[in-house]
Regions:
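A structural signal for short, hydrophobic beta-strand segments that form beta-sheets
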Residues: 88, 164, 256, 312-313
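Catalytic metal-binding/acid-base residues of hydrolase active sites
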Residues: 138, 172, 212, 230, ...
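Flexible, glycine/charged-enriched surface loops at secondary-structure junctions
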Residues: 35, 202-205, 347-354
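Anionic-ligand-binding alpha/beta catalytic cores of soluble enzymes and soluble regulatory domains
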Residues: 178-280
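C-terminal helical cap(s) of enzyme catalytic domains, especially alpha/beta-barrels
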Residues: 18, 75-80, 239-246
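Active-site-proximal beta-alpha core segment in soluble small-molecule metabolic enzymes
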Residues: 2, 7-8, 12-15, 22-23, ...
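C-terminal accessory subdomain/extension
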Residues: 261-378
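Solvent-exposed alpha-helices and their adjacent loops that cap or buttress functional pockets
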Residues: 32, 100, 123-125, 132, ...
């Protein structure tokens, strides 16, 4: 963790508010039945925020489980000393069965080849190893088709050393104000779990809800809510009227690397896509698509300088972006620039950047490059 006093040495950095992470977990948890747990989703480096630090903050705030997408992500948590229950949501290939068992990570099993490899390693270690089974109820990605579930789970029972602890699915449209398809998926999921019970197969943990369903559809909560984007203070959808106030955890900052006045007729950036119509004060921000700032923000995005919005002019390049600071008083070399987040009373949200980049807020934070230091505020 980097001491905040050393920030003067950075050109571009992200500040991660761990108190915001904790507050968001607690705000959602308060809305859940006491019997419902929280699974904090820290895949993709915790949506760009830093998996180890976010995992610790979420667990301290009351999350009972962690979720990742790849086995390597779970191993990294273990190597950092985090021993909380951790589910791999994505595909676990047979070749990684040893890693999963040895690090006590819970896999989502969707093939018998993986199950066989897990069982073999569990037997070698003389252990009973727990797994979860994923059902595709309408997402059309990873998971068993509903009609395959009973036979597949029955086949899993033939593998000595494996215990099926959980069955889960994922909602495709929980972020849509119209809940009809989510409820259709819920019905498919319930049909599967009832068929398993009728076959004499008891699975103790059921989970279906993501952030949007966790906040909007209590009938989907079951035993666990998988808290992803909302934990980071981002709305699952700008179309939803959320029942809790979320606090964004990430602020992306840079600083004025050069300040000058371009004469009328001078161009900025690759392709000369901006030509100054009049003398224009330009601040150079040392941030670009190499840091994760979208090139689609060229000539349309904005950043905050001295609490005011400054327009992006010219093409966003790999390492630098130019801003029109005409009309903003007292801008100086090395002044702080907020790419997204708050500066004084002003704010540019990840949703704003997503709108300019024609994408979603999830992508804006997740794409933040590894070369951008994360500074953790506690």
């Amino acid at each position: 963790m980097i001491d905040n006093k050393s920030l003067n040495g950075y050109l571009t950095w992200a500040e991660i508010d761990l108190k915001a992470i904790a507050r968001n977990v607690q705000a959602v948890k308060k809305r859940l039945d006491p019997t419902v747990g929280v699974m904090a989703v820290v895949k993709a480096n915790a949506y760009g925020h830093g998996a180890v630090e976010v995992a610790r903050a979420a667990l301290a705030a009351g999350a009972e489980w962690l979720a990742v997408n790849r086995v390597e992500e779970g191993v990294a948590l273990r190597q950092a000393g985090i021993e909380a229950r951790t589910l791999v949501l994505g595909y676990c290939p047979p070749g990684q069965a040893g890693l999963v068992v040895e690090h006590n990570i819970t896999p989502a099993v969707t093939t018998l080849d993986t199950a066989e490899a897990l069982a073999e390693r569990a037997q070698q270690l003389d252990r009973e190893f727990v797994i979860h089974v994923k059902i595709d109820t309408g997402m059309g990605r990873l998971g068993l088709l509903p009609e395959e579930a009973v036979d597949f789970v029955g086949a899993l029972a033939e593998f000595s050393g494996l215990k099926i602890e959980g069955v889960f699915s994922h909602l495709a449209t929980a972020d849509d104000p119209d809940p009809s398809f989510s409820r259709r998926q819920l019905q498919v999921y319930q049909d599967v779990t009832q068929a398993l019970e009728a076959a004499g197969i008891e699975i103790p943990l059921h989970h279906l809800a993501n952030s949007a369903a966790g906040l909007q559809l209590p009938e989907t909560h079951h035993h666990l809510v998988r808290l992803g984007v909302a934990m980071y203070g981002l709305t699952p959808s700008i179309k939803l009227d959320l029942p809790v106030e979320l606090r964004p955890a990430m602020t992306l900052k840079t600083r004025v690397a050069r300040l000058r006045v371009l004469p009328a007729g001078a161009a900025v950036g690759y392709g000369r896509t901006f030509v100054a119509p009049e003398p224009t004060a330009v601040a150079l921000a040392p941030v670009g698509y190499g840091d994760g700032y979208p090139r689609l923000c060229s000539n349309r995005g904005e950043m905050l300088v001295r609490g005011q919005r400054a327009r992006v002019i010219g093409a966003v390049s790999m390492d630098q972006t130019s801003l029109d600071v005409s009309g903003i008083d007292d801008v100086s070399q090395d002044d702080e620039i907020v790419v997204f987040g708050r500066q004084g009373e002003a704010e540019i949200s990840a949703e704003d950047v997503a709108r300019w980049a024609e994408t979603i807020n999830y992508e804006i934070v997740t794409r933040l490059a590894a070369r951008v230091p994360r500074i953790y505020l506690e």
